[in-house]
C-alpha cells in the first residue's frame, strides 16, 4: 500500500470525520453519507461484496487496502484490527482526489 495513501488516511482521521468498522461503514453507505470506503484486503469476502454492492448503489468510491485488517488498524493508528472504514469528511486530506485520480 502506498505510503501516500496511509499518510492521507491518517490526515483524514486527524482533521476530518471517519467511522471505523464494518457495521458503521455499512450504515453510512446506506444513508449516503460516505465519501469513500476503505476495506482491508483480507476482510471476509461477504463483507467486501456487501460493501461494494452498497457503494455502487450510492456511487461511492471504494478502495481495497492492500494490507491486512491489522495493517489497516495500524495505518489508522489504532491498537486493533479495522476491516473497513468510511470517510465522511476528508478534512485537510487529499485522499478523495488521490483515489479518484489514481494517486
Task: Report the location of each language-model feature.
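Charged, alpha-helix-enriched surfaces in structured cytosolic catalytic cores
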Residues: 4, 46, 50, 67, ...
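Mid-chain, well-packed structural core segment of small domains
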Residues: 49-81
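C-terminal structural segments of small proteins and small subunits
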Residues: 70-103
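N-terminal first-folded block
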Residues: 1-39
Amino acid at each position: 500500500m502506498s505510503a501516500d495513501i496511509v499518510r492521507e488516511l491518517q490526515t483524514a482521521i486527524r482533521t476530518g470525520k471517519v467511522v471505523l468498522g464494518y457495521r458503521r461503514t455499512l450504515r453510512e453507505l446506506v444513508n449516503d453519507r460516505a465519501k469513500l470506503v476503505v476495506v482491508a484486503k483480507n476482510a471476509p469476502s461477504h463483507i467486501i461484496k456487501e460493501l461494494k454492492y452498497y457503494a455502487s448503489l450510492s456511487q461511492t468510491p471504494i478502495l481495497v487496502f492492500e494490507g491486512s485488517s491489522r495493517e489497516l488498524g495500524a495505518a489508522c493508528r489504532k491498537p486493533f484490527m479495522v476491516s473497513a472504514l468510511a470517510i465522511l469528511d476528508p478534512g485537510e486530506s487529499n485522499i478523495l482526489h488521490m483515489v479518484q485520480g489514481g494517486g
